[in-house]
From Swiss-Prot:
Catalytic reaction equation(s): a (3R)-hydroxyacyl-[ACP] = a (2E)-enoyl-[ACP] + H2O; (3R)-hydroxydecanoyl-[ACP] = (2E)-decenoyl-[ACP] + H2O; (2E)-decenoyl-[ACP] = (3Z)-decenoyl-[ACP]
The protein's assembly and partners: Homodimer.
Keyword Isomerase included in the entry's annotation: yes
Species, as recorded: Bradyrhizobium sp. (strain ORS 278)
Subcellular location: Cytoplasm
Protein name: 3-hydroxydecanoyl-[acyl-carrier-protein] dehydratase
Function: Necessary for the introduction of cis unsaturation into fatty acids. Catalyzes the dehydration of (3R)-3-hydroxydecanoyl-ACP to E-(2)-decenoyl-ACP and then its isomerization to Z-(3)-decenoyl-ACP. Can catalyze the dehydratase reaction for beta-hydroxyacyl-ACPs with saturated chain lengths up to 16:0, being most active on intermediate chain length.
Family statement drawn from the similarity comment of this UniProt entry: Belongs to the thioester dehydratase family. FabA subfamily.
KW Lipid biosynthesis (keyword) present: yes
Pathway stated in the Swiss-Prot or TrEMBL entry: Lipid metabolism; fatty acid biosynthesis
GO MF assignments: (3R)-hydroxyacyl-[acyl-carrier-protein] dehydratase activity; trans-2-decenoyl-acyl-carrier-protein isomerase activity
Record EC number: 4.2.1.59, 5.3.3.14
């Protein structure tokens, strides 16, 4: 049975990472430490900039987050690729949430701009993805634009995030 709530808490995200939310062989989130948000505060098939869906998630920033200790010594900053990965994770979650079958894989993006950095002094990161298109054929493909804000200021913008859901053995190499 598909779980179609409008928001998800941390324990729900962990259940998704264990393959319990969308069924065996379907979209999963990574488990910690690669799970890059603490909750999904909004998910809808009708909202967003393009009217085709939106996902909004939050990460509570704490100075002891795993990446601050190694990136970089005496100059801690969240790696930009982790913020990007969070947006791909959200597109994959959306595809599973809408009933798409298969295992999720990030397939690329059109453009990415950083205008700031996430520091351990921040309190909250908000991620947003606006779904532009979902195609359902041999694979399920989602395309979205996204942004990341730190304490209210948008500091990452991504265009044309692409995520596919692939049946067992069909994922790109």
């Amino acid at each position: 049975m598909l779980d179609r709530r409008g928001s998800y808490e941390y324990e729900d995200l962990l259940a998704c990472g264990r393959g319990e939310l969308f069924g065996p062989g379907n979209a999963q989130l990574p488990l910690p430490p690669m799970l890059m948000f603490d909750r999904i505060v909004e998910i809808s098939e009708t909202g967003g900039e393009f009217g085709k869906g939106v996902v909004r998630a939050e990460l509570d920033v704490k100075p002891d987050l795993w990446f601050f200790g190694c990136h970089f010594k005496n100059d801690p900053v969240m790696p930009g690729c982790l913020g990007l990965d969070a947006m791909w994770q959200m597109v994959g979650f959306f595809l599973g949430w809408t009933g798409g079958a298969g295992r999720g894989r990030a397939l690329g993006l059109g453009d990415l701009k950083f205008s700031g950095q996430v520091l351990p002094t921040a309190s909250k990161v908000v991620y947003n993805v606006d779904i532009k298109r979902v195609m359902r054929s041999k694979l399920v493909l989602g395309i979205a634009d996204g942004w990341l804000s730190m304490d209210g200021d948008i500091i990452y913008r991504a265009k044309d995030l692409k995520v596919g859901l692939f049946k067992q053995g069909a994922a790109p190499s």
